[in-house]
Amino acid sequence: MKRLYCLLFMLLVLARINAGTPVKILAIGNSFSEDAVEQNLHELATAKGIETVIGNMYIPGCPLELHAKNMRTGARAYRYRKIDAFGNRVQVDSMSLSKALADEDWDYISLQQASQLSGLYDTYQPYLHALIAYIRVHVPTKAKIVFHQTWAYAQNSKRAGYENYGKNQMKMYRAIVRASGQAMRTEPIALLIPSGTAIQNARTSSYGDTMNRDGFHLDLLYGRYTAACTWFAVLFRRKVEGNPYAPKGMTPQQVQISQWAADAAARHPYEVTEIKL
């Protein structure tokens, strides 16, 4: 029944795309959602004739526990960054979750765990469950909950929390895969956006372990582009390969690697696919 419901919803989203109605996406996250959706996603969609409205509720390093606390208290704790259908960007400071949820008729609302906790499912609950229940009360039932699977750190990262995974990139990646899979099995989440797998796929290519600018945030060019390509492939149910948009400074081979890594992650979100470029 859940699969049928999700299929019907996707048909409605495709109908909105075909009708020229903006697809509205809200991320409740932190700097990792900033890396993924605040650049490139709007442009990738525009290149294929898809209008979008994209919002990001941003607190640096925010875990699910703090999001849930802000939900309970109504804290005006967020920077709300929004990209409208024309690509105009605005930021509203001191925003609450309830106001952001009411700001648009959202199609997708994403949740994610803070990066250092992303492979530790015990830290997800009861906060993930409470947030989903809250969203269901405050937005129309048509809005779909999606979960953003974030990425493992660079192998040589000095980021606090990396010791949770023995300072081992593949151990962290596998833990993230397990935790995100458990979230998908136990909660009414419609879609997984496997940015973590896309980044790990890209690391098998000639990029190597260069996907991060500081050991944990994404490279500003091809790192962020790879994540945005993954969101595009999953949300719009189409390959990103061949999309003509890429940010200035990327070579044709880099564009191909990022697009292939994203498409492979959309097909196989819980396993690494080697990219031979």
Q: Which residues fall in each region the model found?
A:
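Residues that mark the start of a beta-strand
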Residues: 22-24, 53
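Conserved SGNH/GDSL esterase-like catalytic core that processes O-acyl groups on lipids
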Residues: 35-124, 141
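Alpha-helical cap/lid subdomain in secreted, periplasmic
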Residues: 94-220, 233
